Amino acid sequence: NRNNRDWWHFADYGCYCGYGGSGTPVDELDRC
């Protein structure tokens, strides 16, 4: 499962609902 393997790639991926996240989701993957 790619999402489980690569979750950490999104830790600093303009995260709307991730670590240090704010503002608008950058894309569908960044939505909660």
UniProtKB/Swiss-Prot annotation:
An example Gene Ontology molecular-function term: phospholipase A2 activity
InterPro entries reported in the protein's UniProt record: PLipase_A2, PLipase_A2_dom, PLipase_A2_dom_sf
Principal location class: secreted
One of the record's GO cellular component terms: extracellular region
Required cofactor names: Ca(2+)
SUPFAM superfamilies per record: Phospholipase A2, PLA2 (SSF48619)
EC category: hydrolase
EC number(s) recorded for this UniProt protein: 3.1.1.4
Pfam families: Phospholip_A2_1 (PF00068)
Summary of the tissues where the protein is detected: Expressed by the venom gland.
Catalytic activity, as annotated: a 1,2-diacyl-sn-glycero-3-phosphocholine + H2O = a 1-acyl-sn-glycero-3-phosphocholine + a fatty acid + H(+)
The keyword Phosphoprotein belongs to this UniProt entry's keyword annotation: no
GO biological process: arachidonate secretion; lipid catabolic process; phospholipid metabolic process
Residues given in the record as Ca(2+) binding sites: 16, 18, 20
Function comment: PLA2 catalyzes the calcium-dependent hydrolysis of the 2-acyl groups in 3-sn-phosphoglycerides.
Family, as annotated: Belongs to the phospholipase A2 family. Group I subfamily.
Protein name per its UniProtKB record: Phospholipase A2
